[in-house]
């Protein structure tokens, strides 16, 4: 059996890879590891709207309660809400059933510790070890078996918390919200209406068969159209579990995670709230983002791709904002994970405080053209580019030519016999040529 836990919990095609049996075993092993049998654990369980979430929830809760865990079921709710409610309800852990932005046939199971952080690798390894080795676990009977309790206040608790993360109402703003037929449908329309905004909700029904299909943060085309049609101030697109946000300005242009982070970081710095004047992002954030931050005296630290690496760096350095171009943004003083609703509120509150349109705010950075070319290289040779002097010299030469207004990024594919060559810079034709020549050189040298 391959490793169960990826960078974002256990994920796979529901009922085929992520089966009810596996969900049951994860529940049992998770309940045991979180307490090592020392006390009766309390676990918050939430889910997104996809069809398979009910099936997996029943199996997971059966596993948890069979080890004596008390389960607080919070229903269809955003992933970041589970992280927050785990802390609020003083639970031992939280579990979210969701495959985030993935297609409907997928689902996932993600654990949070009692502080609302994703489980550290060593605890995930321990859960996996128990499942793989079929370790014998306690079998409580009678009153030793746990129960499931449905929370009737979870959505209200989360909405009130979200309101507390900004210091203004949103009266006067007209907002189109795309809920991706997902978990934000239960929160976002209510939240923004209660804050005084005029709300036009799209894809806001809990239709599991439509989650993320032609809508949400990965497909914002319909939202762009609706913002212009309704003459709205902005559009907000969440993904299936609302841990990420992509915005649309009043002209119908996309405002991605890089732009949102730039807007928020510049605003935070002006208020003295940007810790160490630093933002954490991944290697995929555009060079234009880095240049915009530098112009405002803000440092950028880059990590590997994946929000868990961003979060690790934020905790290590004590930084207050970090995220990904995809719209997965963490405001660590507010929540322990990416939270699309918090990101949306921060953006709207900056518009309210400054009186500026979103297109004006987004003009703080220019997205530089980006070219991606694949070099075909055998899997066993993919890491060798690091040792080749000619390749290293060529990369240095290209970056020198761009004089700080461009960059070269080399990333071996994790799944295919390819090395991805990405070049960003001001002149599209020039960087296209650079990327092609560098990919050709890599193929020649490594094959």
Swiss-Prot record:
<comment type="similarity">
    <text>Belongs to the phosphohexose mutase family.</text>
</comment>
<dbReference type="Pfam" id="PF00408">
    <property type="entry name" value="PGM_PMM_IV"/>
</dbReference>
<dbReference type="GO" id="GO:0005829">
    <property type="term" value="C:cytosol"/>
</dbReference>
<dbReference type="Pfam" id="PF02878">
    <property type="entry name" value="PGM_PMM_I"/>
</dbReference>
<keyword id="KW-0597">Phosphoprotein</keyword>
<protein>
    <recommendedName>
        <fullName>Phosphoglucosamine mutase</fullName>
        <ecNumber>5.4.2.10</ecNumber>
    </recommendedName>
</protein>
<feature type="binding site">
    <location>
        <position position="243"/>
    </location>
    <ligand>
        <name>Mg(2+)</name>
    </ligand>
</feature>
<dbReference type="InterPro" id="IPR016055">
    <property type="entry name" value="A-D-PHexomutase_a/b/a-I/II/III"/>
</dbReference>
<dbReference type="Pfam" id="PF02880">
    <property type="entry name" value="PGM_PMM_III"/>
</dbReference>
<dbReference type="GO" id="GO:0005975">
    <property type="term" value="P:carbohydrate metabolic process"/>
</dbReference>
<keyword id="KW-0479">Metal-binding</keyword>
<feature type="active site" description="Phosphoserine intermediate">
    <location>
        <position position="100"/>
    </location>
</feature>
<dbReference type="InterPro" id="IPR036900">
    <property type="entry name" value="A-D-PHexomutase_C_sf"/>
</dbReference>
<dbReference type="InterPro" id="IPR005846">
    <property type="entry name" value="A-D-PHexomutase_a/b/a-III"/>
</dbReference>
<dbReference type="GO" id="GO:0004615">
    <property type="term" value="F:phosphomannomutase activity"/>
</dbReference>
<dbReference type="InterPro" id="IPR006352">
    <property type="entry name" value="GlmM_bact"/>
</dbReference>
<comment type="function">
    <text>Catalyzes the conversion of glucosamine-6-phosphate to glucosamine-1-phosphate.</text>
</comment>
<dbReference type="InterPro" id="IPR005844">
    <property type="entry name" value="A-D-PHexomutase_a/b/a-I"/>
</dbReference>
<keyword id="KW-0460">Magnesium</keyword>
<dbReference type="GO" id="GO:0008966">
    <property type="term" value="F:phosphoglucosamine mutase activity"/>
</dbReference>
<feature type="binding site">
    <location>
        <position position="241"/>
    </location>
    <ligand>
        <name>Mg(2+)</name>
    </ligand>
</feature>
<dbReference type="Pfam" id="PF02879">
    <property type="entry name" value="PGM_PMM_II"/>
</dbReference>
<feature type="binding site" description="via phosphate group">
    <location>
        <position position="100"/>
    </location>
    <ligand>
        <name>Mg(2+)</name>
    </ligand>
</feature>
<dbReference type="InterPro" id="IPR005845">
    <property type="entry name" value="A-D-PHexomutase_a/b/a-II"/>
</dbReference>
<dbReference type="InterPro" id="IPR005841">
    <property type="entry name" value="Alpha-D-phosphohexomutase_SF"/>
</dbReference>
<keyword id="KW-0413">Isomerase</keyword>
<dbReference type="InterPro" id="IPR050060">
    <property type="entry name" value="Phosphoglucosamine_mutase"/>
</dbReference>
<dbReference type="InterPro" id="IPR005843">
    <property type="entry name" value="A-D-PHexomutase_C"/>
</dbReference>
<dbReference type="GO" id="GO:0006048">
    <property type="term" value="P:UDP-N-acetylglucosamine biosynthetic process"/>
</dbReference>
<dbReference type="GO" id="GO:0000287">
    <property type="term" value="F:magnesium ion binding"/>
</dbReference>
<dbReference type="GO" id="GO:0009252">
    <property type="term" value="P:peptidoglycan biosynthetic process"/>
</dbReference>
<dbReference type="InterPro" id="IPR016066">
    <property type="entry name" value="A-D-PHexomutase_CS"/>
</dbReference>
<feature type="binding site">
    <location>
        <position position="239"/>
    </location>
    <ligand>
        <name>Mg(2+)</name>
    </ligand>
</feature>
<feature type="modified residue" description="Phosphoserine">
    <location>
        <position position="100"/>
    </location>
</feature>
